[in-house]
Amino acid sequence: MDEMDEIVRIVNDSMWYVPNAFMDDGDNEGHISVNNVCHMYLAFFDVDISSHLFKLVIKHCDLNKRLKCGNSPLHCYTMNTRFNPSVLKILLRHGMRNFDSKDKKGHIPLHHYLIHSLSIDNKIFDILTDPIDDFSKSSDLLLCYLRYKFNGSLNYYVLYKLLTKGSDPNCVDEDGLTSLHYYCKHISAFHESNYYKSKSHTKMRAEKRFIYAIIDHGANINAVTKIGNTPLHTYLQQYTKHSPRVVYALLSRGADTRIRNNLDCTPIMEYIKNDCATGHILIMLLNWHEQKYGKLQKEEGQHLLYLFIKHNQGYGSRSLNILRYLLDRFDIQKDEYYNTMTPLHTAFQNCNNNVASYLVYIGYDINLPTKDDKTVFDLVFENRNIIYKADVVNDIIHHRLKVSLPMIKSLFYKMSEFSPYDDHYVKKIIAYCLLRDESFAELHTKFCLNEDYKSVFMKNISFDKIDSIIEKCSRDISLLKEIRISDTDLYTVLRTEDIRYHTYLEAIHSDKRISFPMYDDLIEQCHLSMEHKSKLVDKALNKLESTIDSQSRLSYLPPEIMRNIITKLSDYHLNSMLYGKNHYKYYP
């Protein structure tokens, strides 16, 4: 056996599969032969320069032989996941070339190095690029690097050299993304975890410089992908922290905020749908748009609010800051409709309880129907995307006295539409309905005699489950009526939530010997709500008393009358009285 046969034997013994790309031109196509053994070795083996096999390959193999697919040994070694710079240098010293030869995909060895290398070595990069005068014949190198490495750390030496040696910044992949699209993805994906590590990350200096550089080298700032996204769309869609400096860099170099993607959304619309959106960047975008293209009309503002409520499920002050800003900037009133719905209808229809709760708090009427005469309950039950409808209905019921009695009564005819997996919330809903509506249980008893009524429960929650819940609630209500609280009873206090009785309710809530299985949660909610309201009323009265002088007509009112008047104010109005424009900071 000669040494070439020995190379084939050693490589063949270690390989169980030959990829199509490595098939040779000989009779043994699909197998390892003298024609492709060097390529297989350099592509898949952990090349050890001290090994016997490596020395045989160097001695007997043609280091520049190309397969019919175009792969040279240099192509193969640059795609080796165990690539070692010292090995490459030895191969080059032994005559390996083909720096600019292309495989059947149009890739030169540098493509594979950029794609497969875990970390780009500047010296190796120079070795692979210096023999090439310019990259005009391999114009997608910059796109290749960014496409495969955008979610990790980028080498800016590599970026700038690719850019300045002729790599086309307007090359696109099969989805229409350019280098700038991928770079915008990189800024979001990689810098989220590094944002506060240093001032350079916070100020995004390197990122801004490269954005300016790539545009100066001809990148189209408004290039659109196959789904219509510009680089600004792409950046603002990412679910990570955004930098106002990056946004400004894109805007100042000509990013058009009017361009709509295939979903008919501008970059501003895409941003407002993002849970990670912040008020200061939104203000920057809107101000820039209006300075460049004119003032946004009322209907455009309503549409932005609609998109925000429908898609943005962010929680906390950041989300509410945007909501308040949009309501104020576009002067949107509580009873104002967009298409057929108010903002509150949109919130409940799209399960955005964070927004809905705030809108109810500031005075939006939960009982107001849509223009086509639908209640918020109707919107929930008509939305097929809401699987667990009882969860959302419970969020509405949670507003208790703000929900009118006719609305409560309407739920009787929707009980059969609850899912059998919703029984936790169904119990809460039915318990409150029976508390508020004395006819609820009577109506159920009456309908029980009708077999058609029972049959409507066949598809979803069972009739027996509903019947059992109503029976338990009725039993607890009888007990609630027996508990005396001053001049009334516990049942009436829970129905009216009169804060005069909050101390009595607190005593009942803290007494572990008293329990109402179907109403314990409601008692706790009412206790906390009444306690909070009582404290607000006390603070408001103290502030009012400190500002009323003896000449004021209010000073003649008896304290109990004054307290009764203040008690009728909502939490929103009390907080506004106490804290003025800063009232939103005290939103519960």
UniProtKB/Swiss-Prot annotation:
It comes from the Viruses. Keywords: ANK repeat, Repeat. SUPFAM superfamilies: Ankyrin repeat. Residues 557-574 are annotated as: PRANC/F-box-like. ANK repeats lie at residues 69-101, 175-223, 227-259, 300-336, 339-368. It holds the Pfam family Ank. PROSITE patterns: ANK_REP_REGION (PS50297), ANK_REPEAT (PS50088). PANTHER family: POTE ANKYRIN DOMAIN, POTE ANKYRIN DOMAIN FAMILY MEMBER 3C-RELATED. May be involved in virus-host protein interaction through the ankyrin repeats and PRANC regions. Belongs to the orthopoxvirus OPG003 family. This is Ankyrin repeat protein OPG003. It comes from Monkeypox virus. The gene is OPG003.
